Amino acid sequence: MSPIRKPTLEERANSQLPLTSTVMQILLSLSAEDRHGLGIAADIKAFTEGGSVLGPSTLYGTIKRMLDAHLIEDLDSPAGDSDDPRRRYYRITPLGRRVLELETERLATLVGTAHRRRAFKRP
């Protein structure tokens, strides 16, 4: 009997696609730096110019699923951050970074198609 082959990083990444907008936004936030949950929510609100405001249930439910899928990992609080000992920090994993790259490429292709087909009116 031959040994069971583990899926490659690329296979694991492709199995996560397509992403929900919430997962995409969290990965984008963590691609810049490690953050705690409320920092992720604030960053997303800032880079979407208020267009996306994540409530605690959506944010932490999605974070839990992303931890289970190994897209992100939790960290100890950085030295000097004693604001709240319960605060958990998160970091994007190599798998999460590859998923973000693949989803960005997929969405760029869709946007390119929309432009070529003039799917929307320009001012």
Task: Report each predicted region and the residues it spans.
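Amphipathic alpha-helical dimerization/coiled-coil segments
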Residues: 3, 95-123
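A detector for short, charged/polar N-terminal pre-domain segments
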Residues: 2-20
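Beta-hairpin "wing" of winged helix-turn-helix
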Residues: 67-85, 91
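Basic amphipathic alpha-helical segments that dock to polyanions
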Residues: 59-66
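N-terminal helix-turn-helix DNA-binding core of bacterial DNA-binding proteins
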Residues: 14-58
